Amino acid sequence: MFDTSAGSVRPAECTGDGRVGLYVCGITPYDATHIGHASTYLAFDTLQRVWLDRGYDVAYVQNVTDVDDPLLERATATGVDWRDLAAEQVELFRTDMEALRILPPDSYVGVTEVVDEVASAVAELVRRGTAYPVATPDAVVAGAQDLYFDVARAGEDGPWALGDESGYDLDTMAALSAERGGDPERPGKRDPLDPLLWRAERAGEPAWDSVVGRGRPGWHIECAVIALRKLDRPVTVQGGGSDLIFPHHEMSAGHAAALTGEDFACVYAHSGMVAYQGEKMSKSLGNLVLVSRLRAAGVDPRAIRLALLAQHYRADWEWTDELLAESVARLAAWDAWAAAADASATAGADAGEPGELVQLVRERLSEDLDTPGAILLLDLRVATGVPATPVELAAVDALLGVRLGSPAA
């Protein structure tokens, strides 16, 4: 897979012992599930399928950011309790993922489930001198302070240094930090890019008692703690959308390295952004194409999946009605191919053994998850009119996640 930190393709494994760990940043549960979400989780579903096809022992963890400023703001704006909104949206997300046949992680972990563990990690960073307090006059408790991560100290003490993953310059980092939940202008910080580790309680906000005072976790430390708690070190692949490269993945890797003295992951992999009507699909813009609405309109989830697989996971691309129509037509052709399957057809191999087509699909997927290349191979085979063999249909199901012949599958 393409490793963002290296700027090149690297083996998606660490130890060579067949054990692999995948951590993918989950949703903040509001406005779920749009096509951009689905594209990201499908990318790492494909990785998981390739690993499983090779016989690897896969451990996959995904968090749910079930307490965060955007969620709280949406709950306040709509008059809904933030916990109810989170639960409703998580259930919708999981239903959409199941409809798209995206393999579930071994562990879904909500941030609210690990507040104590996060607080303990923050306390450890304070003890090591990698975290420091900042005056917080609007805290509920007089004298309570927010806690921040000292990026300079972390870079001096451990294997991580600011910019290792993203490769961005400081001006780009500052702009992205301000745009993506950071506070580079906050007085009292040692460095404008130092990220929040623990937010002291504010009036009207959820908070928990902890070893570092009453409050709630910062964004990046949540993922670091969950990954370290649930997966072997180092994580084989840390994944997410390319909008998470900085600050989220950069800083979560820094937090993990500061806690362990080791690199967080072997590969940092990122999916491209999806646009709609000329703009990046985003909650803030409201230009969302929701999987649930497509399903409610009668679109076969397999066609949605094929539309996503037709794009390389690292590419930025745009969702259009024409793209969906192409996938609907492709699915119809593939279904007809499956319906004409002849159990005695060998296509150059025994019907119970992988033939050339299956091997070629495996090769394409092994090259940085080249799903467009794999789909082209299937299109060419379907166009020949040669009936599918059972093993070929099983491979399409296992490797691409498309079960042919049944819209309900």
UniProtKB/Swiss-Prot annotation:
The keyword rRNA-binding does not apply. Its cofactor is Zn(2+). Zn(2+) binds at C25, C223, H248. Keywords: ATP-binding, Ligase, Metal-binding, Nucleotide-binding, Zinc. L-cysteinyl-5'-AMP binds at C25, G26, I27, T28, T40, N63, V64, T65, W219, G241, S242, D243, V274. A motif ('ERGGDP' region) lies at residues 179-184. GO terms for cellular component: cytosol. One of its GO terms (molecular function) is zinc ion binding. One of its GO terms (biological process) is cysteinyl-tRNA aminoacylation. Binds 1 zinc ion per subunit. It catalyses: 1D-myo-inositol 2-amino-2-deoxy-alpha-D-glucopyranoside + L-cysteine + ATP = 1D-myo-inositol 2-(L-cysteinylamino)-2-deoxy-alpha-D-glucopyranoside + AMP + diphosphate + H(+). A motif ('HIGH' region) lies at residues 27-37. Its EC number is 6.3.1.13. A motif ('KMSKS' region) lies at residues 280-284. It is an enzyme of class 6 (ligase). It comes from the Bacteria. Monomer. Catalyzes the ATP-dependent condensation of GlcN-Ins and L-cysteine to form L-Cys-GlcN-Ins. Belongs to the class-I aminoacyl-tRNA synthetase family. MshC subfamily. This is L-cysteine:1D-myo-inositol 2-amino-2-deoxy-alpha-D-glucopyranoside ligase.
